Curated annotation (Swiss-Prot):
Single GO MF annotation: transaldolase activity
First-tier enzyme category under EC: transferase
Keyword field contains Signal: no
Top-level lineage group: Bacteria
Identification of the protein by name: Probable transaldolase
Species: Paracoccus denitrificans (strain Pd 1222)
Family statement: Belongs to the transaldolase family. Type 3B subfamily.
SUPFAM superfamilies, per the entry: Aldolase
Length: 217
């Protein structure tokens, strides 16, 4: 499974990347706003840090304008993936941009039917939003399972990029189902290292070591 980090926080990306935890990055207008920086400037800096795909999202609503924005975004760096919404215009833009050889991430997917359309339009990634489905009492993981089954049945090459990740369980459940990629906030990725029994065991080891009166260095 590939790990993408869902943030425009350059310091957080650099920290995880230095540990080999980052295979790519996803951004969106909300994350750019949170960063307080110019979209082109911060996206270029992220692309310089991370070798893998960096999703930069268009903001237009019409296909022609999305295509123009996408063609501008891909000039930032070779590893840019153009992110488009799962609307009819977004699918039209996806088809054109993918036909031009650009990577496309189709985002805001909430149904298997939408995922089929994205694959047919040539999407590199499909981003089903797990947490937002859970918020309205739908099973986000069931959607991942449905898309996995359909894509495997018909050998679609579009990668399932599980998004709207809210917890460590979301990550492990998506991994078990077979999502190709997860994108999660830095805090959730770092939380994967935490376990109460690890803390308890370390506390005991440290207490016992103190009783030996020894030093390693």
């Amino acid at each position: 499974m590939k790990f993408f980090v869902d943030t425009a926080d350059v310091a957080a990306i650099r920290e995880l990347n230095d540990l080999g935890m980052v295979d790519g990055v996803t951004t969106n207008p909300s994350l750019i706003l949170k960063s307080g920086r110019d979209i082109l400037e911060v996206t270029k800096e992220i692309c310089d840090i991370v070798e893998g795909p960096v999703s930069a999202e268009v903001v237009a609503s019409k296909a022609g304008d999305m295509i123009r924005e996408g063609e501008h975004l891909v000039k930032i760096a070779p590893n840019i993936t153009v992110k488009v919404p799962l609307t009819w215009d977004g699918l039209r833009a996806c088809k054109v941009l993918s036909s031009q050889g650009h990577k496309v991430n189709v985002t805001l997917c909430f149904s298997a039917a939408q995922a089929i359309l994205a694959a047919k339009a040539g999407a590199t990634f499909i981003s089903p939003f797990i947490g937002r489905l859970d918020d309205i009492n739908f099973d986000g993981m069931e959607l991942i399972a449905q898309i996995r089954e359909i894509y495997d049945n018909y050998d679609f090459q579009t990668q399932i990029l599980a998004a709207s990740i809210r917890s460590v369980n979301h990550i492990t459940d998506a991994a078990r189902i077979g999502a190709d990629v997860i994108t999660a906030p830095p805090a959730v990725i770092k939380a994967m290292a935490n376990h109460v029994l690890t803390d308890k065991g370390l506390e005991q080891f440290n207490a016992d070591w103190a009783k030996t009166g020894q030093k390693i260095v």
